């Protein structure tokens, strides 16, 4: 018979038997219950919710086309002249790349001016596009039925397209006849048509009725550029990669099941009868190394929800009325007045038994997944002897890691407060107070602090001759000397909560072991070793003895302490609860002592759960103080819930339900770690060397985290997977290098490898996009600049820059290093002043006055009196930020324009002087578009002072990017606009139906005999 015992009132022997497939490298393990008299396996299995068979890495979403992200802005203008009113202004359009299109995941804003950084920047863009566009399928295009040439045609409903409503732009045309003609062209162009080829066929061999075919789709011409739509069209490929018809899943699950399992008939029928367009996550089967889970505390915590779902309790309890009646008789027989004991009995919480059991089970399975705060804990906690008794008994069956350090310190301080008030002799109290060992009892603020363990401080300053208080404190600390009690197991700096983990806040719990040395439950170690599973085990809650007896030494020792603590003969001053109630209180305490063995009912459940779950990857007995509390499940425990545990639980030998680890449990974290490795290799291949050859480790980890997060569609911080040790959350370069150098036995699963291949495919689209990105590899420094197209009908009237043909380069600064040298090298001008070499070169440039840039002739036409502008060219990456205004004839000075002066560049250099490669220098460019055709004012607009001052506002910038480099495309007519925004998209008439997290239950088929004890010497004697 094993230690979990026999079923209650039954003579059947029951054992847990591990079964695995023929190869020990296949790690998903099943644990089954086997009854000796039947010798068949009882099955209950479920596919893990967070597994590769029920979760896709990049879930495909469906969006109406109105929600599709646009890459370009359309800016309509009616071009006029600064010199006269144009009777029929020409309507044209400026096409501008949206500023924030590719700024996600720290792309443009954090680009550094260094070639490997540019490569990395582009690589991050690829992943950004993969997650943002290539996983969104266009599922809806709004349409209208209209009559065109006496035929009904389904056309695009332009009113639903906001700034892509081509009719809005047609309304900007100057003549009504032009507006009408343009709208007719729009109706005929943007229509719905049939599909000749199926956009997606899936790669599976399916019966004809459920195959994809052209008749299931429609094609639409929409006002988007082909580049914009091509990104979304890739989502169909992602759909094929990650999803399949339920028939494929059914076949996979049947092939995967052991000989004695079959997919539940009802679920199987649902999959077999699925029609076309129904999809499930495509199953992926890989042999994965579970040891990767142990490389990171985060990987363990990700299994926390799985741990909690595996907890099962089976507790037999007495009727609460029966318990209340029995206890009330004791209290009432011993007292003639109402007391707190009566109140506690009346408020006993039956549900608290389950709360306590589940809390302790969770705590022993893994001390790093959850923690408890003690409810109703204050300085007067031990005044209530029932609360104090329950709290101390809870300590006896709880590992210290289960209770937040803050609460453990407060418990000690509350006990110290009680001892000093009611048991400590006055001379001892006075000595402790005078020696600054304790604060005054009236200083409740300091007593409530968790900055120090006051009880331990008292112990260090007591003597054996101090009598009762020495005896009680010494026993509370298991009679260890004070120097061991104050010993620090984990310094506060190594914890996430900033409290020293001393022995003093661990000794009162469980076996009294230090929090770093809690005892593991090793009952299944032989199993795990023989199955190549790691040796991690749950925390041992109690010693299972022979004949299914659970050792209660810890509980009994604690109960003896409680009896002495509340012995009224020890009180120098009686607590309020003991005035006129000492007899009833003592009687109830005696009942506690007589009934404390009922805790066995809880310990049985804990031991059984520990035994049943010991093969799961989430089990551990090592406490990691560095794991932040906010990574854990938080629960508030009311110690008084222990009251019904003591008086209401009926111990029995109980075997828990089926112990069956979920299929593929832990694979999510394995895939994360394997993706980290694979994407690291992608980065290295793109750069020609490992990324840390060019960048700081923290920057690499940040970028790596972004890319892994995109592929997994969940926020991943790679640094949290690699720490100095399991007590820290600080990224460790050494741990990372060990991971990278480690030989991983299994390659990335094909699904994820294909997804990474898709990243390379997207690169083709990015090549087109990079040519219009607002990035240049050089810029210029001049004394003055400005563009003023006075008297013209050009689309651009003014800009805070120059045209390239206006620039005369007199000096070239080769790179960042040379710029730094010039800025930081000083030369003396005279005895009192000096300036940098860069300033010297700057002041050598000829200066052109602002009036020259805006000069005009008698007709108001621009007539600058200079041929070129001397400039210094700096070969360094820069980004321009475009701000666009429209001028409609008022010629009011625009709000303050952004201009970069040579001093700004100098400050930029000095602020980044310690960096080998600086951030990209950002240069704003303000542009005024010609929308004068909208103005019908008859005011003179030729050579007025107001117009002069208006154009002069655009002069003065000294660090510029030529206007020629700015991607601002001019489209001269609405017909050309329609040609540019003429994309097509195929949409399924009936959208796909996708079921994520599809649960599959296996049921038993036939008998499958197994050896009851497949491995010798496994179970304790």
From Swiss-Prot:
Keywords: Capsid protein, Host cytoplasm, Outer capsid protein, Virion
Gene Ontology, cellular component aspect: host cell cytoplasm; viral outer capsid
Compartment(s) of residence: Virion; Host cytoplasm
InterPro entries listed in its UniProt record: Inner_layer_core_VP3_Reovir (IPR016029), Innr_layr_core_VP3_Phytoreovir (IPR015312)
Pfam families xrefs: RDV-p3
Function: Capsid protein which self-assembles to form the inner icosahedral capsid with a T=2 symmetry, and consisting of 60 P3 dimers.
Family membership: Belongs to the phytoreovirus inner capsid protein P3 family.
Subunit relationships: Homodimer. Homomultimer.
Protein's name according to its UniProt entry: Outer capsid protein P3
């Amino acid at each position: 018979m094993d230690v979990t015992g026999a079923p209650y009132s039954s003579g059947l022997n029951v054992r847990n038997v591990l079964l695995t497939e023929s190869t020990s490298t296949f790690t998903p393990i099943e644990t089954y219950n086997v009854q000796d008299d039947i010798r068949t396996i009882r099955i209950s299995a479920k596919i893990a919710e967070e597994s590769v068979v029920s979760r896709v890495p990049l879930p495909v979403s469906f969006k109406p086309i109105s929600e599709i992200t646009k890459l370009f802005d359309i800016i309509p203008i009616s071009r006029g002249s600064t010199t006269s009113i144009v009777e029929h202004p020409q309507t044209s359009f400026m096409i501008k790349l949206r500023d924030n299109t590719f700024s996600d995941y720290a792309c443009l804003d954090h680009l550094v001016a260094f070639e490997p950084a540019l490569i990395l920047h582009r690589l991050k863009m690829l992943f950004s596009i993969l997650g943002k566009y290539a996983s969104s399928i266009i599922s809806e295009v709004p349409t209208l039925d209209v009559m065109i040439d006496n035929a009904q045609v389904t056309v695009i409903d332009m009113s639903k397209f906001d700034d892509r409503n081509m009719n809005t732009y047609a309304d900007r045309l100057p003549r009504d006849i032009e507006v009408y003609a343009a709208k007719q062209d729009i109706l005929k162009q943007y229509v719905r048509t049939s599909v000749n080829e199926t956009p997606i066929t899936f790669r599976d061999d399916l019966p004809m009725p459920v195959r994809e075919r052209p008749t299931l789709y429609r094609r639409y011409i929409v006002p988007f550029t082909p580049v914009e739509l091509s990104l979304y069209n890739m989502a169909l490929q992602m759909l094929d990669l990650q999803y399949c018809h339920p028939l494929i899943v059914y076949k996979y699950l049947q092939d995967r099941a052991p000989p004695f399992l079959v997919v539940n008939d009802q679920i199987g029928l649902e999959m077999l009868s699925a029609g076309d367009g129904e999809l499930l996550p495509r199953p992926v089967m890989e042999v994965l190394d579970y040891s990767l889970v142990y490389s990171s505390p985060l990987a363990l915590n990700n299994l926390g929800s799985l741990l909690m779902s595996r907890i099962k309790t089976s507790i037999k309890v007495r009727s609460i009325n029966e318990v209340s009646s029995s206890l009330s008789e004791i209290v009432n027989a011993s007292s003639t007045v109402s007391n707190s004991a009566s109140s506690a009995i009346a408020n006993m919480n039956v549900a608290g038994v389950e709360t306590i059991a589940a809390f302790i089970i969770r705590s022993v399975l893994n001390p790093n997944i959850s923690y408890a705060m003690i409810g109703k804990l204050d300085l007067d906690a031990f005044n209530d002897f029932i609360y104090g008794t329950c709290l101390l008994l809870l300590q006896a069956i709880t590992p210290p890691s289960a209770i937040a350090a803050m609460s453990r310190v407060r418990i000690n301080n509350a006990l110290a407060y009680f001892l000093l008030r009611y048991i400590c002799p006055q001379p001892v109290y006075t000595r402790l107070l005078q020696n600054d060992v304790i604060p005054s009892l009236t200083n409740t603020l300091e007593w409530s602090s968790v900055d120090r363990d006051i009880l331990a401080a008292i112990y260090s300053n007591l003597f054996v001759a101090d009598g009762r208080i020495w005896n009680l404190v010494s026993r509370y600390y298991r009679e260890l000397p004070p120097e061991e009690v104050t010993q620090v197991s984990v310094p506060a700096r190594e914890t996430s909560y900033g409290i020293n983990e001393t022995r003093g806040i661990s000794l009162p719990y469980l076996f009294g072991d230090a929090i770093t040395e809690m005892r593991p439950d090793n009952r299944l170690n032989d199993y795990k070793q023989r199955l190549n599973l790691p040796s991690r085990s749950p925390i041992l809650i109690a010693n299972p003895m022979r004949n299914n007896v659970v050792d209660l030494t810890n509980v009994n020792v604690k109960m003896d302490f409680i009896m002495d603590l509340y012995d009224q003969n020890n009180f120098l001053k009686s607590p309020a609860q003991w005035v006129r109630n000492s007899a009833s209180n003592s009687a109830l305490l005696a009942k506690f002592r007589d009934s404390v063995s009922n805790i066995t009912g809880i310990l049985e459940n804990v031991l059984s759960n520990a035994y049943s779950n010991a093969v799961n990857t989430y089990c551990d007995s090592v406490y990691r103080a560095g794991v932040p509390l906010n990574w854990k499940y938080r629960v508030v425990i009311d110690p008084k819930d222990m009251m019904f545990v003591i008086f209401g639980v009926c111990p029995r030998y109980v075997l828990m339900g089926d112990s069956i680890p979920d299929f593929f449990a832990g694979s999510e974290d394995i895939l994360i770690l394997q993706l980290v490795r694979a994407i690291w290799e992608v980065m290295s291949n793109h750069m020609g060397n490992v990324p840390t050859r060019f960048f700081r480790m923290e920057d690499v980890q940040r970028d790596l985290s972004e890319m892994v997060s995109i592929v997994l569609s969940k926020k991943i911080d790679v640094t949290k997977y690699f720490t100095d040790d399991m007590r820290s959350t600080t990224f460790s370069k050494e741990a990372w290098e060990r991971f990278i150098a480690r030989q991983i036995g299994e390659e990335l699963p094909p699904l994820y490898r294909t997804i990474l291949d898709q990243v390379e495919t997207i690169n083709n689209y990015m090549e087109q996009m990079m040519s219009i990105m607002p990035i240049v590899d050089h810029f210029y420094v001049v004394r003055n600049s400005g563009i003023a197209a006075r008297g013209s009908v050009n689309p651009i009237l003014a800009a805070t820059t120059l045209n390239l043909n206006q620039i005369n380069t007199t000096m070239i600064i080769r790179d960042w290093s040379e710029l730094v040298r010039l800025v930081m090298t000083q030369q003396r001008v005279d005895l009192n002043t000096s300036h940098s070499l860069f300033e010297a070169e700057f002041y050598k440039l000829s200066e052109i006055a602002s009036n020259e840039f805006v000069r005009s002739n008698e007709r108001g036409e621009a007539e600058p009196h200079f041929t070129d502008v001397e400039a210094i060219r700096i070969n360094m990456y820069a980004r321009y930020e475009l701000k666009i205004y429209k001028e409609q004839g008022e010629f009011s000075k625009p709000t303050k324009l952004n201009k970069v002066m040579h001093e700004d560049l100098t400050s930029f250099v000095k602020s980044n002087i310690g960096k080998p490669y600086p951030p990209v220098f950002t240069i704003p460019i303000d542009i005024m578009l010609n929308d004068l055709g909208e103005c019908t004012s008859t005011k003179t607009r030729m050579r007025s002072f107001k117009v002069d001052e208006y154009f002069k506002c655009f002069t003065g910038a000294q660090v510029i990017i030529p206007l020629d480099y700015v991607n601002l495309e001019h489209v001269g007519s609405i017909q050309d606009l329609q040609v540019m925004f003429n994309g097509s998209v195929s949409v399924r008439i009936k959208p796909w139906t996708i079921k994520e997290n599809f649960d599959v239950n296996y049921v038993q088929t036939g008998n499958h005999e197994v050896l009851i004890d497949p491995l010798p010497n496994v179970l304790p004697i």
